C-alpha cells in the first residue's frame, strides 16, 4: 500500500497543493492500514503495527527529503501548528485568529466550492454585533472589509409580525444594545463573500483543498490526521470545525444523529425591493406550524426562508417548489406572497433543519471541537455562525495565554489545560443561546392569532376573530424580556474581547426617527416609500390604478367621467358603481376613502378579514393589503398595494401601472 506523508513547515508556499510533488511514496506490505486510529477503537496489536509503520515512514521520509526536497524543507518546524478540519466560517476565522497570534494553521477542506460557492446554496448570513466585535478583536482590517461589504440591518426596525395580516406583533431593537456598548451594528452578508474575504486573509497556502480528514491519532505530545487519499499531516492541535456532520466529532465520541427540528426550510433570493426598505431590515412572519423570514441583503435583493412542519427527507416535483410554497402560504399577507412570486423557480432551494444539543465535553487530549460540530443551532436567532466566530476568538486567546505561561515557566505548553479553559468559557453562553434558538422556533411555529386556529372541529371559531390568550400574554412577556435578552446576546461577550476599542461607526448611525418608529406604528406607516395602487381582483379589463400621494389632490370614483371636476377622475363603467360613488384623498401620507352617499355602498375588508361598510360622507382610513368593493355584490373589487418604484413590474408581470390623471 502507498502511504504519503508530508512534513510541512511554517514557510507558506509549502502548504499549497502544487508542492505535493515533493511527497515521497513509501511501499509497505499489502495489508491495509487501520480504518480508524483513535485510541478507543484500535486494538493493542493494531496500535503497535501502526507505530511501526509510522517509524518506517519517518525514516524513509527523512532520506527522501534530504535527497530531493528544497533546502527550506530541512529546517526544523518551531511554531505551534493548529490543524483545522473544515473551511467554513468557523474554520477560517480560527485560522485567521491563529495566524494573528503567531501560530501556524492548516485548514483541510474537502471541497473548495464550499469556500468559494457555499453562499450560492445557503444564502446570506447575518453577522450580529457580538460576532462583528469578536472579528474586530481578531483582525480589525478583515472586520472592516466584512462590514463594508455587508448590508446593515440593525439600524432599522426588525421583529415579529402576524403572517396573515402582516401587522406587527413585536419589534426588536438591535441598534441600542450595540450603540450603548460600542459595538458594530448587525449586518447581513453573502456567505460566499464572507468566506472569500476570510480565505484571502488566511492565505491560499494555509488552505489545503481536496482534503478530507477520515481519521486522526493523538500521540499525547502531537496529533496526526489521515486524509482520505492516505496523506498524513502532523500538528500540535486538531480542531474539528467540520460542521453538524463532523467526522472529528464522530471519531472522538462515536456516531450520533443530529436532532431533526421538525421543519424543512425553503430558501430563495429575489430581485425585489419592498416599499419599506428604508425602515425595515428583517421580519419573521408567524403562523401555526409554519413561519416565514425575510431580510434585506443589499444590492436590490431580498433573502427569505420559509419553514414548514413536515417529516424529513421530503421532496418536490421538478420545478414545483414555488407552486408548493404558494399553497402552503395561501392567504398570507402580501409581504410573503409577493416575495415568493418575485423569486425565480431555480433559485428556490430546500433543506431539512437539524441541530445538535450542546455536549458538556468538547474534546479529548489535543483534539477539540468548534462551531456547528459541537453546538449546531436552529437558524431562528441568527447566531449559529456568530457563535463559531466567538468560539474562534476564545480558543485562540486561550492558546496564546498557554504559550505565555509556557515561556514564563519554561515548561512545555499546556495545551490540554488551554482547551479545558476554552470549553469552560464557552459552554454556558452557547447552551443558553442554543436554548433560545429552540424556543424561538417553537414560538414562531405555534403562534395562534385567534381562538380556533389549529383546533380542528373548533376551527369555525376563527371567523369571530377572538384574539388567542397566548398571543396577548406572549406579546407582554416578549415586550419586557426581549430587550434584556438582546442586550445579553449582542453584548454579553464584549467584556472578554481584548485589544478592541469601544467605538461606533458614523456609517452605522440610525435614522433620527428610529425610536419613534418603534413606538408608533402610524409613524412607521407614514414613512413607507413606494407608490400606492388599486389592483382589480376579478375584472381583467381594468388596469391597475395608481393613487396620487398629494395632500392637495384627490380622486373621484364614478361610473361616468369627472374630468371637469377638481379631482382626478377614476372611471369605472359598471352598474354597481354610482355616477359619483366615492372620493379617495391623501393626508400626511395616509389615504382615506369617503363614500359619497352611493346607491349600492362601498365596502372595505381589512387585512385581518373583517368586512364593513364605509359610512356615507365619513372619511375612512385604508391600508396596504385592504380590499375595496364598489357595490355590495363583490364584482368591482380592488386590492390596495404599495410597490417599490423600481420593482413593481417584476411582481405583476409588467402590467401597465401608469397613474390615472
From Swiss-Prot:
It is found in: Plastid, Chloroplast. GO terms for molecular function: FAD binding; zeaxanthin epoxidase activity. Pathway: Plant hormone biosynthesis; abscisate biosynthesis. It catalyses: all-trans-zeaxanthin + 4 reduced [2Fe-2S]-[ferredoxin] + 2 O2 + 4 H(+) = all-trans-violaxanthin + 4 oxidized [2Fe-2S]-[ferredoxin] + 2 H2O. SUPFAM superfamilies: FAD/NAD(P)-binding domain, SMAD/FHA domain. It comes from the Eukaryota. Expressed in flower buds, lips and leaves. Detected in roots. Gene3D superfamilies: 2.60.200.20, FAD/NAD(P)-binding domain (3.50.50.60). Pfam families: FAD_binding_3, FHA. GO terms for cellular component: chloroplast; membrane. FAD binds at residues 81-109, 359-372. Keywords: Abscisic acid biosynthesis, Chloroplast, FAD, Flavoprotein, Oxidoreductase, Plastid, Transit peptide. The keyword Flavoprotein applies. Its cofactor is FAD. High expression of beta-hydroxylase (BHY) and zeaxanthin epoxidase (ZEP) results in the accumulation of violaxanthin, 9-cis-violaxanthin and neoxanthin in the yellow cultivar Gower Ramsey, while the down-regulation of BHY and ZEP results in the accumulation of beta-carotene and orange coloration in floral tissues of the cultivar Sunkist. Zeaxanthin epoxidase that plays an important role in the xanthophyll cycle and abscisic acid (ABA) biosynthesis. Converts zeaxanthin into antheraxanthin and subsequently violaxanthin. This is Zeaxanthin epoxidase, chloroplastic. The gene is ZEP.
Amino acid at each position: 500500500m502507498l502511504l504519503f506523508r508530508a512534513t510541512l513547515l511554517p514557510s507558506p508556499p509549502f502548504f499549497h497543493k502544487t508542492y505535493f510533488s515533493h511527497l515521497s511514496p513509501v511501499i509497505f506490505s499489502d495489508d491495509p492500514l487501520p480504518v480508524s486510529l483513535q485510541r478507543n477503537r484500535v486494538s493493542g496489536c493494531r496500535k503497535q503495527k501502526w507505530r511501526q509503520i509510522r517509524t518506517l515512514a519517518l525514516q524513509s521520509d527523512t532520506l527522501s527529503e534530504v535527497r530531493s526536497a528544497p533546502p527550506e524543507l530541512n529546517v526544523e518546524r518551531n511554531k505551534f501548528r493548529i490543524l483545522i478540519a473544515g473551511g467554513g466560517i468557523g474554520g477560517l476565522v480560527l485560522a485567521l485568529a491563529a495566524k494573528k497570534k503567531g501560530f501556524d494553521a492548516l485548514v483541510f477542506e474537502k471541497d473548495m466550492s464550499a469556500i468559494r460557492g457555499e453562499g450560492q446554496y445557503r444564502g446570506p448570513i447575518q453577522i450580529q454585533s457580538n460576532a462583528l466585535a469578536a472579528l474586530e478583536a481578531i483582525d480589525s482590517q478583515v472586520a472592516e472589509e466584512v462590514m463594508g461589504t455587508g448590508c446593515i440591518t440593525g439600524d432599522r426596525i426588525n421583529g415579529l409580525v402576524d403572517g396573515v395580516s402582516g401587522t406587527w406583533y413585536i419589534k426588536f431593537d438591535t441598534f441600542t444594545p450595540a450603540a450603548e456598548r460600542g459595538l458594530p451594528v448587525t449586518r447581513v452578508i453573502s456567505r460566499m463573500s464572507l468566506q472569500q474575504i476570510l480565505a484571502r486573509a488566511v492565505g491560499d497556502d494555509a488552505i489545503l483543498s481536496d482534503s478530507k480528514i477520515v481519521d486522526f491519532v493523538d500521540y499525547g505530545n502531537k496529533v496526526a490526521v489521515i486524509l482520505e487519499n492516505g496523506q498524513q499531516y502532523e500538528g500540535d492541535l486538531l480542531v474539528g470545525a467540520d460542521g453538524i456532520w463532523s467526522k472529528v466529532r464522530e471519531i472522538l465520541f462515536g456516531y450520533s444523529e443530529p436532532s431533526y427540528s421538525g421543519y424543512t426550510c425553503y430558501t430563495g433570493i429575489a430581485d425585489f425591493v419592498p416599499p419599506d426598505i428604508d425602515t425595515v431590515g428583517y421580519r419573521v412572519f408567524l403562523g401555526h406550524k409554519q413561519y416565514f423570514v425575510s431580510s434585506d441583503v443589499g444590492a436590490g435583493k431580498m433573502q427569505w426562508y420559509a419553514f414548514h412542519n413536515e417529516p424529513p427527507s421530503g421532496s418536490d416535483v421538478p420545478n414545483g417548489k414555488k407552486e408548493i410554497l404558494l399553497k402552503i402560504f395561501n392567504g398570507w399577507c402580501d409581504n410573503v406572497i409577493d416575495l415568493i412570486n418575485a423569486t425565480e423557480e431555480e433559485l428556490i432551494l430546500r433543506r431539512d433543519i437539524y441541530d445538535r444539543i450542546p455536549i458538556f465535553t468538547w474534546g479529548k487530549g489535543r483534539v477539540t471541537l468548534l462551531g456547528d460540530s459541537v453546538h449546531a443551532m436552529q437558524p431562528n436567532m441568527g447566531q449559529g455562525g456568530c457563535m463559531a466566530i466567538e468560539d474562534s476568538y476564545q480558543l485562540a486567546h486561550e492558546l496564546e495565554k498557554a504559550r505565555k505561561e509556557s515561556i514564563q515557566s519554561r515548561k512545555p505548553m499546556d495545551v490540554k489545560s488551554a482547551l479545558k479553559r476554552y470549553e469552560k468559557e464557552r459552554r454556558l453562553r452557547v447552551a443558553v443561546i442554543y436554548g433560545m434558538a429552540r424556543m424561538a422556533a417553537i414560538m414562531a411555529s405555534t403562534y395562534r392569532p385567534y381562538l380556533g386556529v389549529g383546533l380542528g372541529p373548533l376551527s369555525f371559531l376563527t371567523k369571530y376573530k377572538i384574539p388567542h390568550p397566548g398571543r396577548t400574554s406572549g406579546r407582554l412577556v416578549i415586550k419586557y424580556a426581549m430587550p434584556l435578552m438582546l442586550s445579553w446576546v449582542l453584548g454579553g461577550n464584549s467584556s472578554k474581547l481584548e485589544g478592541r476599542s469601544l467605538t461606533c461607526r458614523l456609517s452605522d448611525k440610525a435614522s433620527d426617527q428610529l425610536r419613534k418608529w418603534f413606538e408608533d406604528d402610524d409613524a412607521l406607516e407614514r414613512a413607507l416609500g413606494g407608490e400606492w395602487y388599486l389592483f382589480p381582483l376579478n375584472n381583467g379589463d381594468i388596469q391597475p390604478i395608481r393613487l396620487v400621494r398629494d395632500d392637495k389632490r384627490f380622486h373621484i370614483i364614478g361610473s361616468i367621467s369627472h374630468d371637469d371636476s377638481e379631482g382626478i377622475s377614476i372611471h369605472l363603467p359598471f352598474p354597481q358603481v354610482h355616477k359619483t360613488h366615492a372620493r379617495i384623498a391623501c393626508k400626511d401620507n395616509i389615504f382615506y376613502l369617503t363614500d359619497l352617499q352611493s346607491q349600492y355602498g362601498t365596502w372595505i375588508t381589512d387585512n385581518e378579514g373583517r368586512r364593513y361598510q364605509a359610512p356615507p360622507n365619513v372619511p375612512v382610513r385604508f391600508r396596504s393589503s385592504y380590499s375595496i368593493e364598489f357595490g355590495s355584490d363583490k364584482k368591482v373589487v380592488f386590492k390596495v398595494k404599495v410597490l417599490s418604484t423600481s420593482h413593481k413590474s417584476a411582481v405583476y408581470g409588467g402590467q401597465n401601472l401608469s397613474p390615472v390623471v
